A protein has these predicted regions:
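Conserved ABC ATPase signature
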Residues: 118-122, 126
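P-loop NTP-binding/switch modules centered on Walker-like glycine-rich loops
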Residues: 148, 152, 156-235
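Helix-to-loop junction immediately C-terminal to a conserved catalytic motif
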Residues: 43
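A short, proline-enriched helix->beta-strand linker immediately N-terminal to the Walker B motif
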Residues: 137-141
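Charged, flexible cofactor/metal-binding loops and thiol motifs
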Residues: 3, 205-270
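The feature captures the beta-strand-to-loop junction immediately N-terminal to the Walker
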Residues: 28-30
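Conserved ABC ATPase "signature" region
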Residues: 96-113, 222-223
Length: 270
């Protein structure tokens, strides 16, 4: 809940989830459902809130933001940007920092000479690789990726996703991967949580969720995934009604006003 001028507004409701060591946990849902708010709260980027976040101190979580064009300082060279987390970690030896930066550039698939470039000289995919490297130089074991490929060209997305998976295997990382693109989530995630109006309505392994979804909202989301074969047909599930305001969601189950299986008790209990 966040405190506003008109009082306390609940944005995230009774969310409880576990990201297991070495897995990629996806969080999906339509815009405004609370995905980014949840993850920024985990990182402590929202100060004016109530609630509790419990986390292993050794994880040192870091975030990879959606926009690689706005998350890097345009006035600094890439080497300085990548050295910043090392300075924050107290590594004072300049030569050691530069060597660590060079090694990280190689790890994210870039030449060490990129350290002398500025963000404007890099493509979107290259900038996102730098963002990932910056997070890793903080010695993070939990990376929260907020729509990390949505701003990239389609041809570059697979390269960045494959890099993230390779780094996960190499460094034993854990990811929380936020996306509205269910095809991307299916490609990279191990488990998937579905959010609707600040609540997680379903969480399951990727295989189980995509093959046998339980919640009607999840079924509707999956029915909207495009099928590349024009000969194949999929029945679209159209959800009736408008999305309620996240600041004033319905009582009980937040989905009950749009649910085809609604019962009288749904307005009172979850």
């Amino acid at each position: 809940a966040f405190w506003k001028k008109k009082g306390k507004k609940h944005v995230i409701h009774d969310v409880s989830m576990t990201a297991y060591d070495g897995e990629i946990l996806g969080i999906v849902g339509e815009s405004g459902c609370g995905k980014s708010t949840l993850c920024k709260t985990i990182l402590g980027l929202h100060n004016n809130y109530t609630g509790t976040v419990k986390m292993d101190d050794n994880l040192r979580p870091q975030m990879v933001f959606q926009g690689p064009f706005s998350s890097l300082n345009p006035a600094r060279k890439i080497g300085w940007i990548l050295e910043e987390p090392l300075r924050l970690r107290g590594i004072t030896d300049r030569d050691k920092r530069r060597q660590m930066v060079a090694d990280m550039l190689v790890d994210v698939g870039l030449d060490p000479s990129f350290a002398d470039r500025r963000p404007r000289e890099l493509s979107g995919g290259q900038r996102q690789r730098i963002s990932i490297g910056t997070a890793l130089l903080m010695d993070s074991r939990l990376i929260i990726a907020d729509e990390p490929v949505s701003a990239l060209d389609v041809s570059v997305r697979a390269q960045v996703l494959n890099l993230m998976r390779e780094l996960k295997e190499k460094l034993n990382l854990t990811y929380i991967f936020i996306s509205h693109d269910l095809s991307v989530v299916h490609h990279i995630c191990d488990r998937v949580a579905v959010m609707y109006l600040g609540r997680i309505v379903e969480i399951a392994s990727k295989q189980q969720l995509y093959s046998n979804p339980v919640h009607p909202y999840t079924k509707a989301l999956l029915s909207a995934i495009p099928i590349p074969d024009p000969e194949l047909k999929r029945e679209r599930i159209i959800i009736q009604g408008d999305v309620p305001s996240p600041a004033n969601p319905p009582s009980g189950c937040h989905f009950h006003k749009r649910c085809p299986y609604v019962r009288p008790e749904c307005s009172d209990v979850i």
